[in-house]
Every structure is written in structure tokens, then in C-alpha cells.
């Protein structure tokens, strides 16, 4: 059986640009792309924390260290500059692979500078 697990997440990034007439995609600061282990043109899910919108697109590289998170093309209609978003990607793997797999979790500040990384999420308590 193949399972779909969270591969990577960039948590609560701030949309810095929104380019409706640019060819589709989300441009992500190259430093964040690498820290998350995301590839250019990889399918990513975007979850807008600010307005609840959810959509998929593909990642492209923005300038390394620029802090750019730019939602482009038709997807630009789902965000506004300043919105908080989560960028996530999933990977298919066997049960044996899933038993030892840990995702790349990247956390950023309001300027989209990486603050820290992790490979697990704390247990939620009441």
C-alpha cells in the first residue's frame, strides 16, 4: 500500500507579491525552497490562513534570501499581499518508508526569513 505523507511545509509565510498576469505558480525564496527540500515545478498546496482559501499550483525559485513569496496567475485571485499562507507538499511512500520518514518543516518570520526548521510537530493537547 502507498501512503501520502507530508513531505515539506513552509509555515505561515507572508505573501509579498501577487502577480495576476504572470505565468502561474508560486515563487518562493530559494533559501526556503532548499530548506524545505522542494523542487522547482513541484506541485504544492497553498493554504491561506488569512481567508481560508486552499489551492494547488507549482513552485518556482525566487531570488535566494529575498523573502519573496509571490502567488501568480489565476491563483493570485485567492490571496492578497500580506496574507499568511502555508505551503505544503506531499510524497507517496510505502508503509515501511512512512514508519521512519520525517518531513522538512520550515518556519519563517513576518519578512519570510527562516527562523528555524524541524522534522516533527508537537503533540496537540487540550
Curated annotation (Swiss-Prot):
InterPro entries: Asp_de-COase-like_dom_sf (IPR009010), Asp_decarbox (IPR003190)
Residues modified as Pyruvic acid (Ser): 25
Cofactor names: pyruvate
PTM: Is synthesized initially as an inactive proenzyme, which is activated by self-cleavage at a specific serine bond to produce a beta-subunit with a hydroxyl group at its C-terminus and an alpha-subunit with a pyruvoyl group at its N-terminus.
Keyword Ligase: no
One GO molecular-function entry: aspartate 1-decarboxylase activity
Cofactor comment text: Binds 1 pyruvoyl group covalently per subunit.
Active-site positions on this chain: 25 (schiff-base intermediate with substrate), 58 (proton donor)
Entry's family note: Belongs to the PanD family.
Task of the protein: Catalyzes the pyruvoyl-dependent decarboxylation of aspartate to produce beta-alanine.
Protein name in UniProt: Aspartate 1-decarboxylase
Taxonomic placement: Bacteria, Pseudomonadati, Pseudomonadota, Gammaproteobacteria, Lysobacterales
Amino acid at each position: 500500500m502507498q501512503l501520502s505523507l507530508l513531505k515539506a511545509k513552509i509555515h505561515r509565510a507572508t505573501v509579498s507579491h501577487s502577480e495576476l498576469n504572470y505565468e502561474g505558480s508560486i515563487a518562493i525564496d530559494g533559501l526556503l525552497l532548499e530548506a524545505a527540500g522542494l523542487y522547482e515545478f513541484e506541485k504544492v498546496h497553498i493554504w491561506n490562513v488569512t481567508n481560508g482559501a486552499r489551492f494547488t499550483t507549482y513552485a518556482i525559485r525566487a531570488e535566494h534570501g529575498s523573502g519573496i513569496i509571490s502567488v501568480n496567475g489565476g491563483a493570485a485571485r485567492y490571496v492578497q499581499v500580506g496574507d499568511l499562507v502555508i505551503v505544503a507538499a506531499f510524497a507517496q511512500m510505502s508503509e515501511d518508508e512512512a514508519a521512519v520518514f520525517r518531513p522538512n518543516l520550515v518556519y519563517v518570520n513576518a519578512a519570510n526569513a527562516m527562523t528555524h526548521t524541524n522534522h516533527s510537530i508537537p503533540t496537540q493537547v487540550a
